[in-house]
């Protein structure tokens, strides 16, 4: 894996409709609104307050500075300056499939159902396999999150129920502790 790409080499990716770009300070307000929205955060342990949301943006920016990739801010040119994020995260927690790279996404509800999460994820996966030369990318979510795992399947990711896991950062009795794991490798991605 080439994790030493200069951030300038990947500060922007272009999809047919979307711009995946570096985060701006002006994104923080819209992101905080998303993270405080119970609909957006339905399958996360809790909504985030402004300080927690800003701290997440800070971690994203630090990840980019350190690794040369991360979750990009999503812009829909001509329509919206910020609609959410999609991108790549290092998985370092204590799970059987780590260390690896995860793809994740979060969009404002006004942009759901338009194929934008899929477009952004395809753009990020192209980057993961073509530029970073990753052997595999994973994604995971809670079983009730059909929208998310449905997208994983539409992306060609595959699930093996034997690999499902309990999220180590959630309490043993937390209702969202159980997670399902999807994978796609470079060869499968190239075949699509």
UniProtKB/Swiss-Prot annotation:
Disulfide bonds: none
Ligand binding (CoA): 105-107, 113, 145, 150-152
InterPro entries assigned: Acyl_CoA_acyltransferase, GNAT_dom, N-acetyltransferase
Keyword Acetylation attached: no
Gene Ontology MF terms in the entry: acyltransferase activity, transferring groups other than amino-acyl groups
Keywords of the record: Acyltransferase, Transferase
EC number: 2.3.1.-
Primary enzyme class: transferase
Matching Pfam families: Acetyltransf_3
Boundaries of every N-acetyltransferase domain copy: 18-187
Keyword Transferase (UniProt): yes
Transmembrane segments: none
Function summary: Catalyzes the transfer of an acetyl group from acetyl coenzyme A (AcCoA) to an acceptor substrate and releases both CoA and the acetylated product. It prefers the peptide Asp-Phe methyl ester (or aspartame) and the peptide antibiotics polymyxin B and colistin. Other substrates like dopamine, serotonin, puromycin, chloramphenicol, D-glucosamine, glycine and N-alpha-acetyl-L-glutamine are used and displayed lower activity.
Protein name per the record: Acetyltransferase PA3944
Organism phylogeny: Bacteria, Pseudomonadati, Pseudomonadota, Gammaproteobacteria, Pseudomonadales
């Amino acid at each position: 894996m080439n994790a030493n790409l200069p951030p300038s080499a990947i500060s922007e990716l272009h999809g047919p409709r979307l711009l995946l770009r570096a985060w701006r300070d002006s994104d923080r307000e819209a992101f905080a609104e998303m993270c405080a929205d119970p609909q957006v955060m339905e399958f996360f342990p809790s909504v985030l307050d402004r300080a927690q949301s800003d701290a997440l943006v800070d971690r994203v920016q630090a990840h980019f500075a350190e690794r040369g990739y991360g979750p990009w801010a999503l812009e829909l040119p001509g329509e919206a300056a910020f609609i959410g994020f999609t991108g790549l995260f290092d998985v370092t927690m204590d799970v059987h499939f780590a260390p690896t790279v995860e793809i994740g996404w979060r969009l404002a509800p006004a942009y759901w159902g338009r194929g934008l999460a899929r477009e952004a994820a395809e753009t990020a996966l192209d980057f993961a396999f073509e530029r970073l030369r990753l052997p595999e990318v994973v994604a995971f979510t809670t079983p009730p999150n059909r929208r998310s795992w449905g997208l994983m399947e539409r992306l060609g990711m595959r699930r093996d129920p034997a690999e499902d896991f309990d999220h180590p950062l959630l309490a043993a009795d937390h209702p969202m502790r159980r997670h399902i794991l999807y994978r796609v490798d470079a060869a499968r991605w190239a075949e699509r």
